[in-house]
């Protein structure tokens, strides 16, 4: 049941200071990614890496951020670096990871924000459904590429690195349960690539289900003294994600957003709460807004547990063909 009015969300607590910290945020040139970047800089982050698909747009954002009066007041000389990252492309993920490892000594916080929600099945260069490629596969590869690097940074600093992944409570109502269930003996990844398994208004949530299942599998394999991983849902936020919809649907969604959607600033608070405020208690947890939530009924069901197990095995097999897996992913 969707609440008509979303709960009130409080601002971030006072006293957060990011002096000396380096943060990477994907999808940083628009929407919540850009807003979270602004907030990070106002919190005096020393270095912020804008990981973006369109470098020219990213550089324009960086220029605007440097000229922002509120940022200048709190953080007059931050390092704002733009790096190309197209999460629709495995090769771009690998190039970005290599550049990051070579150019940035330590990353303290990695925010996985980039995402899309398409209403028809499109293919990425990998052959996978594009929504799932962007929201799931490429983020898993990015984690695999950067995990040893993040762990090494934690050893240097004496504090755990953070991975905060933007998820969605839409994963709780999945087409995999009734509308497009996985058949006995069918692979999870193969199923997600089938035309007949693509349920337009549920594919975004289905892709986010894979994300949260992967996190639930990964977290117990990580030492939270070295890396804390969590996932959050900011709820409905007034961003341009609905721009991909056909005009008639966009008009309807925009009407709903006009009375229900949160300001983008609030979405930024929710992202940064997971990345900066909550501690080890959030490791391997999904947060609705700022509240740690239980696993969904489907994930806890026997069918959900079987999918989660198969998903891990199949994903690791695929990612293992692209990169040398860290021990935690073997």
Curated annotation (Swiss-Prot):
Catalytic EC class: oxidoreductase
Gene Ontology molecular function, alphabetical: oxidoreductase activity
Biological pathway: Secondary metabolite biosynthesis; terpenoid biosynthesis
Question: Which UniProt keywords are listed?
Answer: NADP, Oxidoreductase
Q: Name one GO biological process term.
A: terpenoid biosynthetic process
Q: Which InterPro entries match?
A: NAD(P)-bd_dom_sf, SDR_fam
Q: What is this protein called?
A: Short chain dehydrogenase macD
On the tree of life, the source organism's domain of life is Eukaryota
Which family, according to the similarity comment?
A: Belongs to the short-chain dehydrogenases/reductases (SDR) family.
Q: Which residues form a coiled coil?
A: none
Locate the active site: 204, 208
**Which PANTHER family does its entry note?**
DEHYDROGENASE_REDUCTASE FAMILY PROTEIN, PUTATIVE (AFU_ORTHOLOGUE AFUA_3G08550)-RELATED (PTHR24320:SF252), RETINOL DEHYDROGENASE (PTHR24320)
Q: Which gene encodes it?
A: macD
Q: Which organism is it from?
A: Penicillium terrestre
**Which Enzyme Commission numbers does its entry carry?**
1.1.1.-
